[in-house]
UniProtKB/Swiss-Prot annotation:
Protein name, per record: GTPase Obg
InterPro entries reported for this sequence: G_OBG (IPR031167), GTP-bd (IPR006073), GTP-bd_Obg/CgtA (IPR014100), GTP1-OBG_CS (IPR006074), GTP1_OBG_dom (IPR006169), GTP1_OBG_dom_sf (IPR036726), OBG_GTPase (IPR045086), P-loop_NTPase (IPR027417)
Pfam family, one: MMR_HSR1
Principal subcellular localization: cytoplasm
Protein family according to the UniProt entry: Belongs to the TRAFAC class OBG-HflX-like GTPase superfamily. OBG GTPase family.
Top EC class of this enzyme: hydrolase
Amino acid sequence: MKFVDEAFIDVAAGDGGNGCVSFRHEKYKEFGGPNGGDGGRGGHVFAVADPSLNTLVDYRYSRRHEAKRGEHGMGSDMFGAAGDDITLKMPVGTIISDADTGEVLFELLKPGETITIAKGGDGGFGNMRFKSAINRAPRQKTPGWPGERRNLKLELKVLADVGLLGMPNAGKSTFIAAVSNARPKIADYPFTTLHPNLGVVRVGPEQSFVVADIPGLIEGASEGAGLGHQFLRHLQRTRLLLHVVDLAPFDESVDPVAQATAIVGELRKYDAELYEKPRWLVLNKLDMVPGDERAARVKDFVKRFRWKGPVFEISALTREGCEPLIQAIYQHVRAQQQAEQVQEVVDPRFADDAASD
């Protein structure tokens, strides 16, 4: 599934340090020759493509990034130290453009690729630079040059790691709103979700995964019924499918097992490879089930559904059971990322563009 994630940042490279006016102090000589050193270079701002990242979510919480300025020159021919550089980790596929003009400045297309997005200013000259046969005791110096400052727009075509499957009103939108920054429309009637919603689930610093809420499927979706047929193809590039089931439907005549079986049938009809993709069962709306009935209802569902895979019991509304599920998803996604070998193929984010060339 392809979405566009974006963030705006301000970067400032370090200013160069100022040059120094200084003279040697020797015995019987009040002023020796000039020995004022140059200022140090300001720190650069680099960006590096990190294959372990898949969103720009961290840059929404930290917009300003500044490198250190260079130190000033000193006497005894001592140059100022260069300012510390900073390196910003960004996902592979990030497009960096000028926020004011829209001009594309850089693209990070390969893992480990490093670019300079703001250059530090050069250090100023000390007075030793101005010594000449005519001027043996120069008092001139120059200030450091300012570092580059830029307002940048970061743009990333995001691939969803996790896709949510389920019948309309199974609670997928409530789940994605509970665990991520997405705010889909939520209501008590089917087909609330009319378009895919993307949510970034933050597990920790530089630890996140992307989850996509697909419009609810109905029986016959693989042949074009309902709203879900046009979105089934987007699930093919996800790393994990979560099959969300409403375990407590308002209509008591509705059989959750029959609904879940219909969803699995649509997957099998649409694409055998998609059907074989890792899939976990998420039994939702347990807050609507009396506590003394939960275990029996879950056991009955799993038995009738003939399910052998992982099962998670949650209430997206109260967030009960959501945290263990989030941690398990992250571990699964991370393991798959590490197992995938870097191959020289067209990045899926740009597959459409490459096909049209």
